[in-house]
Amino acid sequence: VTLTGDDQLGHANLNLNGATVTATAGIILDDAGTGLATVNFTGTAAQTVNGTINATSTTDEGTVNVLASANVVTFANNIGATATNILAVNIGNATLAGNAVFSGNVEAATITLGHESSVASAAYSADFNGNVVGDVVMDTGNAITETATATFAGNVTGDITLDDNVAAIDATATFDGTTAQTVLGTVAATTDTDGALRVTNTAGVTFQGVVGSSSTGIGSLGIASDS
């Protein structure tokens, strides 16, 4: 499946809501000028996606949206790669929650979980079982019961930003791998006391960048015994 946006013809959008989506040769996203290529996963029940999703070049092309509300979308293969980096992966938006499991690696310029303008009492989640390359933003909306939780089992190359839009600590990043992990990038709070950082990996996690700052400290830091 190839989606190609075009300056003259406009955007290319594909909505997929079947229980099983199989793209034997993968899904290719091609942004051309102002024409954007976007694939939306909108499963009405739990959804499994078989096949890679890539851009046509290294210039950050294409958008992947997970908009299936409480239904979990599981991606069996890699999304993006060094030479075919995706522009954006969005899990949920302002009106629909998103919950995703990524079995392979994910490479995108930006990976966004949740939405700052959401007013729904929704739970946004992402389970990354491979390596992640790209900047990750975890953003809860204006409802106090809204949560954005991400678990990382592999290495992360990019910055992680935790943003609680209400007083509760609702944006939580957990590192739960079974082998040693490395985070190449910062872990930052948008405002002071935003977010929670958890380490449950008993093999250890090395953070090579700054975690929080004197003016915008992380709201909660938890390290499990033997981690």
Predicted feature locations:
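Extracellular beta-strand-rich, repetitive "passenger/adhesive" scaffolds
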Residues: 1-22, 28-48, 56-82, 90-105, ...
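Short, solvent-exposed S/T- and G/P-enriched segments that are highly enriched in secreted/extracellular
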Residues: 133-136, 157-159
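UBL (ubiquitin/ubiquitin-like) substrate-recognition surfaces
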Residues: 219
